[in-house]
Amino acid sequence: MEKMSRVSTALSGSALTGRTMHCHLDAPANAISVCRDAAQVVVAGRSIFKIYAIEEEQFVEKLNLRVGRKPSLNLSCADVVWHQMDENLLATAATNGVVVTWNLGRPSRNKQDQLFTEHKRTVNKVCFHPTEAHVLLSGSQDGFMKCFDLRRKDSVSTFSGQSESVRDVQFSIRDYFTFASTFENGNVQLWDIRRPDRCERMFTAHNGPVFCCDWHPEDRGWLATGGRDKMVKVWDMTTHRAKEIHCVQTIASVARVKWRPECRHHLATCSMMVDHNIYVWDVRRPFVPAAMFEEHRDVTTGIAWRHPHDPSFLLSGSKDSTLCQHLFRDASQPVERANPEGLCYGLFGDLAFAVKESLVAAESGRKPYAGDRRHPIFFKRKLDPAEPFSGLASSALSVFETESSGGSMSWFVDTAERYVLAGRPLAELCDHNAKVARELGRNQVAQTWTMLRIIYCSPGLVSSANLNHSVGKGSSCGLPLMNSFNLKDMGPGLGSETRLDRSKGDTRSDAALLDSSATLVTNEDNEETEGSDVPADYLLGDVEGEDDELYPLDTEHVHSEEPEYVLPQEAFPLRHEIVDTPSGPEHLQDKADSPHVSGNEADTASLAPVDSSSSLLSVSHALYDSRLPPDFFSVLVRDMLRFYAEQGDVQMAVSVLIVLGERVRKDIDEQTQEHWYTSYIDLLQRFCLWNVSNEVVKLSTSRAVSCLNQASTTLHVNCSHCKRPMSSRGWVCDRCHRCASMCAVCHHVVKGLFVWCQGCSHGGHLQHIMKWLEGSSHCPAGCGHLCEYS
């Protein structure tokens, strides 16, 4: 803002002078437009509508068009345009769907001229015809474009884009009857204003909404478009089909694009979010901007070159409530700070490294490029004296190939094809993916899936029969035992009745011992015990006991008020039948009279013989509750995902993100998730894993990723007889006048799935061919071939 460079430009006898300057507005600006003499600029927004004079040292407010006591939605502007033939005529697009024209020559304070209320939703764009003084075009969120004759009260024609909303409309500077429109679904349409029934041409320009477009002021047929896919594309519309001739990759969604006057290959862009700067690009050098303006502190909403024949002054409005004039000489040049070296990995692990030839020559002590074969590829071309660049440095590209044994990516492909990310319970997903990783030799990944299963999956209820069977047979198909130890390591008194009979001086109560959730197993037909509320976070635990030497426990971490747990009866198999201690059952019968034990519990508390092969004692309850919150492991899992992403295994990060869903998604910011998703999808598409890529896009909850499947798809059809491309006008070939893809059964055109015989090439609708071959094996076309549907 403090730069004081001055410029004086001669324009048809007059001169534009000024400096880099700004002024504070009363409210954020949504759009700006410049008068044809470049002396005034209009600023419009939801709460501002003013005209400023552009003087040599500052902006001076000339007129406030928001008049009246009551605020009106007609003054809430989404766009504004100043007529380039009549300096008194303006038009605004209101957020309530009203198009308003303003006549600055009216003597009253209220300059409002006409209101057009035909749109049903917000009007995004208004545009005057460049040579016809009374023609105004508008595009709205309702999907319609309307052409108004300012001498009439209603629109003269309506254009339907067959889409959700229109984002931009622009009249062609060179073609009198042509205008372009951009849409939310990524399409660009070209219309003839004389034919409102259908567009002249339509093509998909971007993956996602196309927010802006601009016709080149000199080259007829050059159309620049910008969209949410962070790209600016230049199209040649003079050919039979729209041809992309330039593409510029930006770092954020493109909100505005304007060609720079007197510079054929330069255009200016600003972003819709994230990035507040304004960039001027040379489309021949799409990776580094030629100039950058950094004055704004919030999103830039409108840009306009001050004069159609002056490339030095750029005006901009922003949400930071400032209006700026940028002097091109004061712009920063990122190319001066750019790194001239490049590094990139190939699909199969090859590493490419590009460096300036001068650096290579200096390090190797040799002269510049003289045909040295140590650097296999050199980029060098003859410099055009007319180009604005001061010079082009020749670069040397070295390619390093990986070893055949160490660069294989088969594990990535196998993992992507075999992973299951949805459609099953979480435990099954983790088990399946762990098995896949283990079979591919990725033990750390397999262990990670296993730990995720243990952390987030409840162990569930396991019947005593199944539990004993698993323990006795050594099966690993069930859930792992939470607490287990060998009975052989315990004292001999554990199985006697003295373990149940405690003295009155014992501090542990009988109710804690004979709780309703712990009963002795009588046989395999016993009912399951009630479920435990202990979380699955407990991997190991201690068992309650009377002797410290048998049941070691760290008492420092046990709260005195926490509930105590005892051995569940179903996991208490005895080693042998007790026949010589008759006092045991009597003692239990006495315990049945206790108010702490019900009769049913006493009846089932008999000591039945159990198979001696069952030598493990399992505890389904933790000894004490550690009061861990549900999201105790969230930070750990988040760090684990970032670890895998930083190691380059974005496949694991995305897979876990999809499988766990909301359990972990809330702990990772949206931008990081989007970066992981897009990186993984790019890898999948490089390996031609289209189905897996589509599944990842469908399962993603990121808006920027899920919208990748919402872009329109263009299907090109050739005539089956003369091979001529079919036009978009129908299913009849323009050359041979035959219908394409005729069904051999119903003799109608197949506009959907077409199935054909590989032997005779006849076919038709899928359902028709299937039904035909159910009753006959001969071709329905009558060629005599025996067709078979498999």
From Swiss-Prot:
Keywords for the protein's UniProt record, in alphabetical order = Autophagy, Lysosome, Membrane, Metal-binding, Phosphoprotein, Repeat, Transferase, Ubl conjugation, Ubl conjugation pathway, WD repeat, Zinc, Zinc-finger
How is the protein modified post-translationally, according to the record? Phosphorylation at Ser-155 by AMPK in response to glucose deprivation inactivates WDR24 by promoting interaction with 14-3-3 proteins, such as YWHAG, preventing assembly of the GATOR2 complex. Autoubiquitinated; MIOS is required to prevent autoubiquitination.
Q: Record's PROSITE patterns?
A: WD_REPEATS_1, WD_REPEATS_2, WD_REPEATS_REGION
What the entry lists under Pfam families is as follows: WD40
The biological processes this protein is annotated with in GO are: autophagy; cellular response to amino acid starvation; cellular response to nutrient levels; positive regulation of TORC1 signaling; protein K6-linked ubiquitination; protein localization to plasma membrane; regulation of autophagy
Q: Which segments cross the bilayer? A: none
Where exactly are the zinc fingers annotated as RING-type? 741-790
- Spell out the SMART domains in the cross-references: WD40 (SM00320)
Entry-annotated residues carrying Phosphoserine? 155, 470, 496, 594, 598
Zn finger (C4-type) start-end: 718-740
Pathway note: Protein modification; protein ubiquitination
Phosphothreonine sites (modified residues):
581
Question: Which family does the UniProt entry place this protein in?
Answer: Belongs to the WD repeat WDR24 family.
Provide the protein name: GATOR2 complex protein WDR24
Which gene holds the coding sequence for this protein? Answer: Wdr24
